[in-house]
């Protein structure tokens, strides 16, 4: 395990990462995500050097590497890369984080029943059965007025300590791009009045409380990570019904019915390597949206000697598609899946998109395993 990485930035990292065998059935989450980032047939950055860090055991059975070590490892990986002889610099490090911290409402991992809700603190005011919101103290009323969800078994868990580790990695030059989460909750800005919104409920006779609009580590708004929400797969360009949203989202990207490589189930590969045992399947989630951004950013970074998290944010700010999403076509309340609530009207776009004929673009060639040079010509051709 990575147990001896130094935090002083002076000594080389020591320790190793070990992986234990696990016979549990996988849902191929990481494989699908990696295929979107850099897969040869369905990915963006087809010539990227790929490195995998197993953050969890078999998804989602639990933490594998301590969250407090993940970002130390990324910092060490980035800071002590071998200098590229072509550029005289270390290559940029673009990372995707399609995972997030969660809390469960109870040990049975069941959805929170409305009957167990004691109160909601919303923008500094406490609401309860004696002081209801405008829509009344009912489940639908609380959802409409305050954006609390009762159909989910868990909520996003933000950690200031982990967020500080993420920021350290960003400050050291690592680009961190991550999924917003799939709770259909607002992710507030730390400076606004929704940051301290909390829910208070009972379980087994004890009172419990959680902030519910702070997002989840590592992609929370109290660090500079790039937070990606999911775009629906309709021509109206609405946000996906499951995605977290709000003022702390940086950009939306396709996240519904995304086709990528899979395990040993799904659609067998009959186009490129029939009989090879390769399979592809579709998946939904902000986990599928985030690697779209990471892949495009990695492709862009191939033309840069230096590429930081700030550079990536700047690119997304300047070159995403603006004001083309459909928001607030319904009531505009928290219970309306089209509500904007401060979300950016902005989604990922590549100016030099894939072929317009055929389902996908044919592979350009096999990825090299040695002799990689940097930088390579970017496949993006954006206009200033």
Residue ranges and their predicted role:
Residues 34-37, 51-58, 95, 255-334:
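Hydrolase catalytic cores
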Residues 11-27, 78, 157-161, 167, ...:
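N-terminal domain-start motif of subtilase-like serine proteases
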Residues 52, 82-99, 103-108, 225-227, ...:
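C-terminal subdomain of the subtilisin-like protease fold in secreted/lumenal serine endopeptidases
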Residues 35-42, 210-217, 334-335:
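Intrinsically disordered, low-complexity boundary segments flanking structured domains
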Residues 1-2, 6, 174, 201-302:
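Extracellular S/T/G-rich loop segment that most often corresponds to the catalytic His/Ser-adjacent loop
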Residues 1-69, 83-94, 103-108, 171-173, ...:
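Subtilisin-like serine protease catalytic core
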Residues 30, 47, 54, 181, ...:
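Residue-level detector of functionally special positions within alpha-helical transmembrane segments
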Residues 56-220, 274-291, 329:
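Substrate-binding/access-modulating region of protease and related hydrolase catalytic domains
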């Amino acid at each position: 395990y990575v147990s001896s990485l130094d935090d002083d930035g002076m000594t080389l990292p020591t320790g190793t990462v070990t992986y234990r065998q696990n016979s549990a059935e996988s849902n191929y989450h990481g494989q699908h995500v990696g295929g979107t980032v850099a897969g040869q047939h369905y990915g963006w950055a087809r010539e990227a050097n790929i490195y995998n860090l197993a953050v969890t055991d078999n998804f989602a059975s639990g933490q594998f590497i301590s969250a407090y070590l993940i970002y130390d490892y990324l910092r060490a990986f980035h800071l002590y890369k071998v200098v590229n002889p072509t550029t005289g610099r270390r290559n940029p490090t673009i990372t995707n984080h399609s995972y997030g911290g969660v809390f469960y409402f109870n040990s049975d991992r069941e959805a929170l029943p409305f009957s167990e809700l004691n109160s909601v603190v919303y923008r500094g005011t406490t609401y309860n059965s004696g002081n209801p919101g405008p829509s009344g103290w009912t489940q639908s009323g609380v959802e409409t007025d305050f954006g609390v969800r009762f159909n989910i078994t868990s909520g996003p868990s933000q950690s200031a300590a982990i967020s500080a580790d993420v920021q350290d990695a960003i400050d050291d030059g690592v680009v961190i791009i991550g999924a917003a989460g799939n709770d259909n909750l607002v992710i507030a800005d730390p400076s606004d009045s929704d940051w301290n919104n909390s829910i208070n409920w009972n379980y087994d006779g004890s009172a419990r409380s959680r902030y519910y609009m702070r997002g989840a580590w590592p992609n929370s708004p109290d660090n500079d990570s790039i937070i990606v929400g999911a775009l629906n797969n309709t021509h109206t360009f609405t946000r996906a019904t499951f995605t977290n949203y709000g003022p702390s989202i940086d950009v939306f990207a396709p996240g519904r019915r995304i086709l990528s490589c899979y395990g040993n189930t799904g659609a067998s590969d009959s186009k490129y390597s029939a009989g090879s045992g390769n399979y592809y399947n579709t998946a939904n989630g902000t986990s599928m949206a985030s690697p779209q951004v990471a892949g495009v950013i990695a492709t862009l970074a191939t033309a840069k000697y230096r590429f930081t998290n700030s550079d990536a944010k700047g690119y997304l700010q300047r070159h995403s598609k603006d004001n083309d999403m459909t928001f607030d076509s319904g009531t505009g309340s928290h219970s309306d899946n089209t509500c904007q609530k401060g979300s950016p009207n902005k989604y990922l776009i590549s100016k030099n998109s894939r072929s317009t004929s055929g389902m996908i673009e044919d592979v350009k060639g096999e990825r090299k395993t040695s002799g990689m040079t940097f930088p390579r010509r970017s496949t993006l051709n954006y206009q200033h």
